Amino acid sequence: MHKRCGMLLTLLLCCLLCLAARAEDAEDPVTLRALLVGCDEFLSHENIAPSAEMNVRRMANMLATDIREYAAIVSAGQGVGSVQALRELMQQTFAEADDNDISLVYFCTHGLYDRVTFQPLLVLSDGISEENLTADSLRDALDAVAGQKLLILDACNSGAFIGKGAWDAQLRNSFQSADYQVLTSAGARENSFLWRDRDGVGGGSYFAQELCEGLRSREFDYNADGQVTLAEAYQGLLESHGASTAQSYPQQSDFVLYAYDPDLADTAERPIGAITLDSAVLSEKEDTLYFSFTVRRAVRVQYQLIYYKNGLWRFDTPQTIEDPENETGALTPGRKERSVSLLAEEDEPYGYVLLQLVAQEGRRAMLAGSRLIAVQRDTGNPVLRIRCGESFDPAQGEELAVYVGHRFPCSLTVTVRDAQGQTVRRLAYKTPSRPLGLGSEASLFYWDGRNAAGELAAAGEYVIEASCTVDGQNYLVTSGTVRIGK
């Protein structure tokens, strides 16, 4: 009898705690606010108008479709000219934020490095004044905002702000904190690309367009639960955004980036969607790319193949193919299957290619989607090399960077094993490599210290294995010991 009474009291206490939590949430609901900054006109750098302002509009339109409803979406599409002006704008936008709120900040601008300290910078400019923003200054300004902060950086080298996208001892994560969620358009050594139409009235960044379209079309919602997490958005960008490599912190975050009602129609803007490759890997012998996509409304379509040469995407010399249905006027709505063949490359018949779908409606042309293809060698030893740190503390938000070098493009499997040789986590499984702007062929992976179930791995010793198969031959390399805990 006493045991039953004890259980009953425990259940009642749990119910009261749940009711108290719900009442507290009702009294202090989560409020979302956003500040969107786009810098187009510069004093000492190339102007990028109208791309940044168009990105700000695109982001604002996307956030306005989030069913959680933002209390404020402040757009600074004409830029911000100084760090002090940015601080004041943040204070005004997020003045009422409390510990229960979410504050989103988006930047589209130039990203570069200080020539003396080699620290990453964002360029603030309104066309009249200009000042560089360091990672520490940005962190300091955001620390003054209560609650959870979501930072989206759309700039060259933006991964450097979270220490990702390069193997460099000088890189550090300036936003390592439970208060921050960060998504960047590129790695620490990569350009982040913009596009503009011929008339100069349309444009934007590849990253912002893919992010907004992936959210609004719901293609990034892999489990179709009506919520797109940061981890899902990151995965979606890896698949749909090939010109640079998006980075995120935390690496596998369940933080909700976007929410929608599954019972309502999507709000996708593009005339083309659901682009699917039969395979993202081609070879020296198989040089024909097969893909399919859905036409949402009548449109003319052109395909461009952009080749990666000497560490650069050759946007200036695309291989252009007109869709055969253009001859009859336009592609009609429905599912389409297409194929294109790569140009023969005698000097180096392997590397990376970007497939771009360009849609034209009347006089308006727009980038309607892109996919990255790795052209891999049929034979040869990839000469795998692996590097990683000796220890890290995931309980403090630290992540382990894993560098895997390889002589040529290949598909990698990266596995974390414990001291008994058991698999703890797969960081990659037959994942095609991609260009990172590192100067030599290499891939980077990040372990957040969690196992396959999403739980923090126990303190102890681990190793990282990287492997790939070329011409039926398996190649394997193993790291030194990595320790979690003291």
Kindly label every feature range from the protein language model.
Residues 289-295, 398-406, 447:
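Aromatic/hydrophobic beta-strand junction motif of beta-rich domains
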Residues 355-403, 459-486:
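C-terminal tail/sorting-segment detector
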Residues 309-310, 417-423, 462:
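Short, glycine-anchored, charge-dense loop/turn motifs used at functional sites
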Residues 100, 298, 335, 348-354, ...:
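Extracellular Ig-like/FN3 beta-sandwich strand-entry sites
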Residues 313-348, 423-457:
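Glycine-centered tight-turn motifs at strand-turn-strand junctions
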Residues 21-279, 284, 297:
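Cysteine endopeptidase catalytic domains of the caspase/legumain-like
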Residues 9-18:
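Bacterial N-terminal signal peptides
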Residues 222-230, 284, 288, 387-399, ...:
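Acidic, glycine-anchored loop motifs typical of Ca2+
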